[in-house]
Amino acid sequence: MAPPSQDVLKEIFNLYDEELDGKIDGTQVGDVARAAGLKPTQAMVTKAAGQEFKRKGEKRLTFEEWLPMYEQLAKEKEQGTYADFYEGLKVFDKEETGKILAAELRHILLALGERLSADEADELLKGVEDGEGMVKYEDFIKKVLAGPFPDQD
């Protein structure tokens, strides 16, 4: 898949411009890159930005300031393929049913690797747990890799 043109990147960037001033919040650097098709970790975003933006309102960035960060992220080896996630979660599927306990998956998201907040984990797990408290991890991985859909419930 060809990378998006600069015009398309600008359109994506503008979708995140909440104050309509031609800028995004520094905390959105990774979100905009992900909306443009990249899959950077938070560590990669911090490295590309040269700093970590922890608080909303701390710094606002123009498209011209964001674009080099995006370009650096685009050069990085793509992180976390479907096969990587599948093999990682399969380890927890003791009965080889294609499912793991939702509580165990939540614990994994909160405690291992690049840890999520409780709210982030809950958002990812929304709608994937079956009536028995299990998650079909193949469907979960596909949902995660499909990208962020911030306004979709």
Curated annotation (Swiss-Prot):
<feature type="domain" description="EF-hand 2">
    <location>
        <begin position="80"/>
        <end position="115"/>
    </location>
</feature>
<dbReference type="GO" id="GO:0005509">
    <property type="term" value="F:calcium ion binding"/>
</dbReference>
<dbReference type="Pfam" id="PF13833">
    <property type="entry name" value="EF-hand_8"/>
</dbReference>
<keyword id="KW-0518">Myosin</keyword>
<protein>
    <recommendedName>
        <fullName>Myosin, essential light chain</fullName>
    </recommendedName>
</protein>
<keyword id="KW-0505">Motor protein</keyword>
<dbReference type="GO" id="GO:0005863">
    <property type="term" value="C:striated muscle myosin thick filament"/>
</dbReference>
<feature type="domain" description="EF-hand 1">
    <location>
        <begin position="4"/>
        <end position="39"/>
    </location>
</feature>
<keyword id="KW-0677">Repeat</keyword>
<dbReference type="InterPro" id="IPR002048">
    <property type="entry name" value="EF_hand_dom"/>
</dbReference>
<dbReference type="InterPro" id="IPR050230">
    <property type="entry name" value="CALM/Myosin/TropC-like"/>
</dbReference>
<comment type="subunit">
    <text>Myosin is a hexamer of 2 heavy chains and 4 light chains (two regulatory light chains and two essential light chains).</text>
</comment>
<dbReference type="InterPro" id="IPR011992">
    <property type="entry name" value="EF-hand-dom_pair"/>
</dbReference>
<dbReference type="GO" id="GO:0005859">
    <property type="term" value="C:muscle myosin complex"/>
</dbReference>
